[in-house]
Amino acid sequence: KDSIDKSTKGIQEEIFSMRLIPARFLFSQLRRIIRDISKELGKDVYFEVIGEDTHLDKEILDKLSAPLKHMLKNSLDHGIETPEERKKAGKNAKGFLKLELYQKGEDIVIEVFDDGRGLDSKKILRKAIDFGIAFPNKKYTEKEIFNFIFIPGFSTSGFVTEISGRGVGMDVVKNNINELNGTIEIESV
């Protein structure tokens, strides 16, 4: 019986390891998206990825694909400025976008960072008030304000483009992450 249990456990571990694939398969898709969208937007961006050799369950990697694509598109469209805007702000004309994936204990941590303009909390709050999800006289923390972007239909964009402005996206990102029993946090410096 003991050897059967060990054999069964060995088979289970083998099957599980066959489901694990390196994140590089997803990252190569993301590189193409970054290249195409930055070209379309007239933005020059250096895209750094860390953690390509981290192995994840294929199903989890598939479920992370859409949220990561959306977050990176948002960074390009809303965060990273055009080369001209960056020069005026005293920055390098080439923007910087980083995606890092690593394991921390049992958790998988994914960080998306860009050196763009950051989130405009005043603009988000104004839009939230206009959208009817915030009160004009109430004081909100920055975290509370940033969480408005996860409300379905919410957008700070003044117009619709192929990339953004439809109010569809960050709520889906949050839902996808929640389905994986994950959390999402936004910081703006």
Q: Where do the protein language model's features map onto the residues?
A:
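Contiguous mid-protein beta-loop-alpha structural module that forms a pocket-lining wall or clamp
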Residues: 186
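Residue-level detector of anion-binding/catalytic polar loops
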Residues: 44-46, 134, 183
